[in-house]
Amino acid sequence: MLKKIFIKTFGCQMNEYDSNRIFDTVKKIGFEKTEKYEDANCYLLNTCHIRDKAKEKVYHEIGRVKKIFREKKKPIVVVAGCVAQAENQEMLKREPYIDIVIGPQSYHKINEAILNHLKNKKKEEETEFDTISKFNYLSQIKNKDSKVSSFLTIQEGCDKFCHFCVVPYTRGPEYSRPFDQIINEAKELVQSGAKEIILLGQNVNAYSYDEEGKKYRLSDLLIKLDSFDKLERIRYTTSHPKDMTDDLINVYKTSSKLMPLVHLPVQSGSNKILNLMNRKHTIEEYLLVYEKLRKINPKIEFSSDFIIGYPEEDEQDFKMTMELIEKVKFINSYSFIFSPRPGTVAANLTLVDQKKSKQRLEIIQEKLFNNQIKKNKSLENKILNVLVENKMKDGIKLFGRTEYMTSVIFDGNIENIGKLVQVEIISSNQNSLFGKLTESSKKKVA
């Protein structure tokens, strides 16, 4: 009988990529994927440790699984990802229902862990930083993720050690995959139907790989991918302002496939706070990158991340953040109240009054919300290029994205999926655009 695995993924796009590759791996020992908890022989939770209460989410999910399988045979329970890396021994002690914990740099060993557990009925723990072995192994397994828009990890870990961040401790130091390994996986994705590839890394623009005296950087990868005939779009995330080098910026001038949306987290508009965060750049340096990019390609827009209520943030610091938002006019951003992560420098700092932090968060989110509304409203009555990704749940409308990652919903034929079409925008809200196929796009399908 074929074994079934249920995979639930929390957190970033890299976790989504990891979950896909975990499934590619466990297929080798006979697993197929199920979307139903109750059918699973193996339940895997791929976790994120960035936000507050990450551990408690894990225990809550395990509690749900316990209830479902109260009168059924217990599945193998695997906790993977960054929470597993950070809390491995504690998790195994606190929750006996967990059978295996496996860190993000060890999931190539998941088959061995599962088979050992089945044989010995003992808890298994794999949490070594073994990034080279992981990617060498994964390069031998075909990436079956054939979505129209597909993720591709090129770099992992971080050496920046921002004082609020757990990534250096859960993902390890910066590691860049071999250039040819990435290109080969990209070719597989395109051959499987991918029209857009999103390059991933905790610090993706720090990508640097030396081979026989040749140093490859992110710009080299982008230029190579730009030459793929059947690939329509290229994106990358997440970037650090310090690594936004001139060679990378110049690709925005020459590439027709690199999308004009740059996700460039800044976290705060105050140099005082950036210094306390150990961000290793100033607002002036951030704005210089912004100006260079806009000069190279005036179509470029920006999105960002903001941490509100970081220790010692005062009204003047917050005002500077609001001024930065007004200047750059980010079209999409993520903002959160600071939550201390165990093991980081900031975990030991005095918190800003939570009432003040919540008030500031409401103000900044309203500003960012209005920016999005204004941007989307400006697109009404315009014709946009949309990459069609899938059909909506109603089975009638189609879903796609613009160059700026904005969702577009419209009536269309399923034969449009995977194609670039032109859509006339009729209306909008904060998150989405609504439109209709142009006559020329209808004729192409017909």
Swiss-Prot record:
| EC number in record | 2.8.4.3
Residues annotated for [4Fe-4S] cluster 1 binding in this entry: C12, C48, C82
Q: Which residues form the MTTase N-terminal domain?
A: 3-119
Q: Which cofactor does it need?
A: [4Fe-4S] cluster
How many cofactor units bind, and how? Binds 2 [4Fe-4S] clusters. One cluster is coordinated with 3 cysteines and an exchangeable S-adenosyl-L-methionine.
Q: Which GO terms describe its molecular function?
A: 4 iron, 4 sulfur cluster binding; metal ion binding; N6-isopentenyladenosine methylthiotransferase activity
Q: Which family does it belong to?
A: Belongs to the methylthiotransferase family. MiaB subfamily.
Could you give the subunit structure recorded for this chain? Monomer.
Indicate what this protein is called per its UniProt record.
tRNA-2-methylthio-N(6)-dimethylallyladenosine synthase
- Record the organism: Pelagibacter ubique (strain HTCC1062)
Q: Tell me what gene encodes this.
A: miaB
